[in-house]
Amino acid sequence: MTEYEFSAELVFWGDALDSKRLADDLHLTVTQSRVKGEPLRRPDGTDSGSVAKTGMLSCECSSQDASLRRDPEGQLRVALGALKRLAGPLRKTYGVADAELQINVYYRDKTGGDPDFMFPSELLDLLVQHRIELRITVLP
């Protein structure tokens, strides 16, 4: 059987993005957040001399449960639950201009056909409703 890890993240961008409110409503672990015009920091915490051109919020769908790293459907259910908690339309309520559900599948061995998983239809409906693009990347 092929060893793989699955990573799903919801990523939001917008000049008027209310990342604090959005993160609070999603109840997911924030992996990155920045506010338009805020100084960008290097990994060591020092000022890079640049400022964020737009707001951004990235949240992962697996960090609260390590067993989800190999459970695509589990992570998609986490994303579904997070989107169901939203108080209203992304653009109007949170200032979101663009959004993606980013999915990465990392394989140790290249074997076609693994993993096999289903997208919950209710998740797909919410992605369309909120105009969230779906991006899938498969990496060796």
Segments and roles (model prediction):
Residues 1-138:
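Acidic (Asp/Glu-rich) sequence patches and key acidic residues
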